[in-house]
Amino acid sequence: MQHTHILIIGAGMAGTRFAMQYAKSRLSAHSGLGIDSQGEQSQDEFAITLINSEPYAGYNRIMLSPVLAGEKRFAEIYLFSQEEYANHNITVKTGCTVSDINLAAHQVITDSGETIGYDKLVFATGSTPFILPLPNHTAKGVMGFRTKADVDAMLDIAKNNHNGKKSPKCLVIGGGLLGLEAANALVQQGAKVTVVHGAGYLLNRQLDKTAADLLQTYFENKGIEFVLNANSQAICVDEDNQVTGLTYTDNVDTSIPAKTIDSDCIIMTVGVRPNIALAQQVGISCERGILVDNQMRTHTPDVYAIGECVQFDNQLFGLVAPVYEQANILLHTLNEQPGSTSPVFSIQPTATKLKVSGVALFSAGDIDVSHDCEQLIYQDPSHSIYQKITVKDDRILSAVLYGDVQEGGWFFELIQNQQDISAIKDKLLFGKAFCEELLAG
């Protein structure tokens, strides 16, 4: 009989997905076991404990934007039900924080003083929003956009006539994916929203300026205001330490005097930082994240890490695709049989889709590469369609699509495979079906 207790710190998307995958794999193996030499049913016993500091476990953070917008209820975005956890030998402890770990004894200690043993320990502690260290950054009304508590706080301001105002003012710092999702959702809840962004155009890591301008026009038509090339200087507060606005300067023309935007709350969407404090505290090797190898093993025996708390090959991970792949790799690592070879984790190109109703947007590959490259461009201004494919040595380096993204999956496949497109390059923007017919003819 083999008994394994997996203890997972963090019940977010990475932790809960791994827990369920591991449980299903062990239960499947158990169902196929035969009779042992004593004539008894062979057993492969296991238990999984998920510990989460939030009062909720296993919800889809990607869907917090629709919850904020009022398009979904929070109850609809749970990844698994309580019954599913129970049926898969998974114990979930919410509102519980691991305060210390005895690595030698294979035990964790919680904030309530409980000691829990483990055979294998998995860090899935995720990340926390980065709050710009501006003057008054701890004031009431300054928040990130990461948890249900953040959503509840924003809804309280946007929907409940904050300070008696029918249309409260919300300011979002950061014009990336998360910031735009938050801004769009808050507008739908009746707030007046301004997005302050440090770069000269939105989504500057995923788009070029042409696509970004189309996107900005779309949001402006919904009532969102934008301040670009803005360098946030200080958060303004009243006598109760409640946010009243933001002071900023122009980071291009420094001769322009500082300006202030009035606001009832400030949402920071300027990136995240891996949550590694506990790992550092107990001596697990960390740099910007918890260091792991390509099988998700840390430098400490029987300790593993997956998700946004991880650093691999000097990279951090904030998208769901690599996080889920890490969970899959760890599953194989822990189920590896003697003499077998487990798959390993590697960094792959990722694609971006904006999760805002009415926006068709796709970006993949390295959009910053331009030297010695060809750019294939199609534009239809009357229908707000823009497509740009960047090619070098007859291989696609990146794709930016706005308005019509139906070929995004195909372009992404060509980027991943680095396929030679010389035979179809001139017709590439006509789409997959046309190009395949061209090659067949």
Regions found by a protein language model. Give the residues of each.
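Mid-to-C-terminal Rossmann-like scaffold of FAD/NAD(P)H-dependent oxidoreductases
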Residues: 2-3, 11, 309-409
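C-terminal catalytic lobe of FAD-dependent flavoproteins
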Residues: 246, 262-283, 359-440
